[in-house]
UniProtKB/Swiss-Prot annotation:
Residues 283-495 form the B30.2/SPRY domain. A zinc finger (B box-type) spans 92-133. GO terms for cellular component: nucleus; P-body. The lineage of its organism: Eukaryota, Metazoa, Chordata, Craniata, Vertebrata. GO terms for biological process: activation of innate immune response; autophagy; defense response to virus; innate immune response; positive regulation of canonical NF-kappaB signal transduction; positive regulation of MAPK cascade; positive regulation of NF-kappaB transcription factor activity; protein K63-linked ubiquitination. Residues 137-225 form a coiled coil. Its EC number is 2.3.2.27. It is found in: Cytoplasm; Nucleus. This is Tripartite motif-containing protein 5. The modification N-acetylalanine is found at residue 2.
Length: 495
């Protein structure tokens, strides 16, 4: 009887929207009550889809928001109702077999279930070992107590892992924010020439932050869920251990399986000593280099090419572009002229028309899209010795060549003097070029006896510098397109 009354009362204080006991109940003037959250959400939905019309979800009578009032009386009833425990009849159902209606007195060892005497005689449990619940209660009490201690230990580990992952997440955030600040500060002085480097580095850090924090956030969520799972499991076991024998053994198979199947998952971490460490560029060196390039450009001279009968290079009418003929055709047509196809390289060189005998001189050469070239300065051709290539046309400073070159599209090198064992072969030294130049600047300081090469594409970084050059006679700009038919172009000072 009392149970039926409680059911009726519960129906009266149930929210018509969420069908749960009212939470912070609000009443409309029509008399219907709703959870504050439910009626608020309904109000917003009505405003969105029904052009501002507000009506009771139950009786559809219109209402105004200012007429909604908190219902303290209903709230008190709900609070009291939540405190009401199960009736004796409802509690009695737990002690009886759901299938046979008999009292649950036995425990099946194989299935780890509490059963009645009719269950024991059924086909399902035939041949199983059954005991009175009191006979196995102590055994399972010990098992669950041991499991509880193990779970508490794992719970502590889970909480520590959760705390560690939170700390690591915060640490990563601070570290990356610090790096971002450093990047911004380091690039401040060279904003005009380092914008792209700054942007690139910041994008890398943003990507690193996004990837790592996303992974750590995912791990954090997993650790929170794992910790919550542990808490619920511990709470369940504590409740069983503090309750009756029936509560201890009811569903014990399921909880034991959960414990046996449970493994403590550890979060994915990112060791800081393995991360990509940001290295700020040598800003002072870059600034000095930029200033040096700005300084040498004051000595820019308008260089043009000087056609001659020695070179087989193709010079354009504007005398600024030089390209190579097809080497195979030239070799077949004039095979007697060259000792080998390899010597073809020396016969495609061309000089600039300007003779340098003193002072400072600078010019730039466009080498974009070329896979091979040689450029620098030369002490001049010797037409009478044209065929004596080994002595007069190999690229060594002692023979009057201060040049650098490219071959196979990626191999940059400088030509130095050969050894005493190979006097007629230059010593080719590889150059480290991070950004391939589309334009190369050449600067000659005749009095200082230096020839410098700048990567204009990379903010004027110095590619190489010849020192202590022996300028015993006039030198000329030198260009050689090698066997690549794409032209080299002398840039005008206005470009």
């Amino acid at each position: 009887m009392a149970s039926g009354i409680l059911v009726n009362i519960k129906e009266e204080v149930t929210c018509p929207i969420c069908l749960e006991l009212l939470t912070e109940p609000l009443s409309l003037h029509c008399g219907h009550s709703f959870c504050q959250a439910c009626i608020t959400a309904n109000h917003k939905k009505s405003m969105l889809y029904k052009e501002g019309e507000r009506s009771c979800p139950v009786c559809r009578i219109s209402y105004q928001p200012e007429n909604i009032r908190p219902n303290r009386h209903v709230a008190n009833i709900v609070e009291k109702l939540r405190e009401v425990k199960l009736s004796p009849e409802e509690g009695q159902k737990v002690d009886h077999c759901a299938r046979h209606g008999e009292k649950l007195l036995l425990f099946c060892q194989e299935d780890r279930k509490v059963i009645c005497w009719l269950c024991e005689r059924s086909q399902e449990h035939r041949g199983h070992h059954t005991f009175l619940m009191e006979e196995v209660a102590q055994e399972y009490h010990v098992k669950l107590q041991t499991a509880l201690e193990m779970l508490r230990q794992k719970q502590q580990e889970a909480e520590k892992l959760e705390a560690d992952i939170r700390e690591e997440k915060a640490s990563w955030k601070i570290q990356i924010d610090y790096d971002k600040t450093n990047v911004l500060a380091d690039f401040e002085q060279l904003r005009e020439i380092l914008d792209w480097e700054e942007s690139n580095e910041l994008q890398n850090l943003e990507k690193e932050e996004e990837d790592i924090l996303k992974s750590l956030t995912k791990s954090e969520t997993e650790m929170v869920q794992q910790t919550q799972y542990m808490r619920e499991l511990v709470s369940d076991l504590e409740h069983r251990l503090q309750g009756s024998v029936m509560e201890l053994l009811q569903g014990v198979d399921g909880i034991i399986k959960r414990i046996e199947d449970m493994t403590l998952k550890k979060p994915k971490t990112f060791p800081k000593n393995q991360r990509r460490v940001f290295r700020a560029p040598d800003l002072k060196g870059m600034l000095d280099m930029f200033r040096e390039l700005t300084d040498v450009r004051r000595y820019w001279v308008d260089v043009t090419l000087a056609p001659n009968n020695i070179s087989h290079a193709v010079i354009a009418e504007d005398k600024r572009r030089v390209s190579s003929p097809n080497p195979q055709i030239m070799y077949r047509a004039q095979g007697t002229l060259f000792q080998s196809l390899k010597n073809f390289i020396y016969c495609t060189g061309v000089l600039g028309s300007q003779s340098i005998t003193s002072g400072k001189h600078y010019w730039e050469v466009d080498v974009s899209k070329k896979s091979a070239w040689i450029l620098g300065v030369c002490a001049g051709f010797q037409p009478d010795a044209m065929y004596n290539i080994e002595q007069n046309e190999n690229y060594q400073p002692k023979y009057g060549y201060w040049v650098i070159g490219l071959q196979e599209g990626v191999k940059y090198s400088v030509f130095q003097d050969g050894s005493s064992h190979t006097p007629f072969a230059p010593f080719i030294v590889p150059l480290s070029v991070i950004i391939c130049p589309d334009r190369v600047g050449v600067f000659v300081d005749y009095e200082a006896c230096t020839v410098s090469f700048f990567n204009i594409t990379n903010h004027g970084f110095l590619i190489y510098k010849f020192s202590q050059c022996s300028f015993s006679k006039p030198v000329f700009p030198y260009l050689n397109p090698r066997k690549c038919t794409v032209p080299m172009t002398l840039c005008s000072p206005s470009s």
